[in-house]
């Protein structure tokens, strides 16, 4: 008896797509996906090939400190997405089941992000922070400056990982301005 065993990798081999500029962010970017989006306007004005990878409702840092790295929705935070760019594996993002309103574009966006040839990306815009603020994400940890479950720790971790993997990449953070909430 001859047994033939086929191994299927968890992630299909995709044709990598080159982009000059990638945008990550929350609903400010994610909910506007047409020719009026910031990514589309930048592409129109500069001729750079831009991709809008914004996902509404997401955060910069990881969200569930109780579960730590076992919470799959954390993989769509900016920190989680950057980790996937660096290791070139979007397998965990494909396991996330989002059932909230206005997320019908998530599956396509996450699939597209997994195909981007990040070695070709020149500029990464990360626009995030309001959801971190409103969800009560701590500003930073005194014991771990790279704690991705804090806002500043996530920024430090993102910059460190990207600098090590893509030293020529320009990283631009667009964070919310100071606002007084009552």
Model-predicted segments: where are they?
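Gram-positive cell-envelope targeting signals
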Residues: 1-18, 22
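Short, conserved loop/helix-junction motifs that constitute active-site signature segments
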Residues: 14-16, 118-119, 164-166
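Non-membrane alpha-helical structural segments and their capping/turn regions in soluble enzymes
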Residues: 103, 145-156
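A general structural detector for well-ordered alpha-helical segments in enzyme core domains, enriched
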Residues: 38, 112, 151-158, 162
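Active-site segments of SGNH/GDSL-like serine hydrolases
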Residues: 125-137, 159-182
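Conserved SGNH/GDSL esterase-like catalytic core that processes O-acyl groups on lipids
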Residues: 28-141, 145
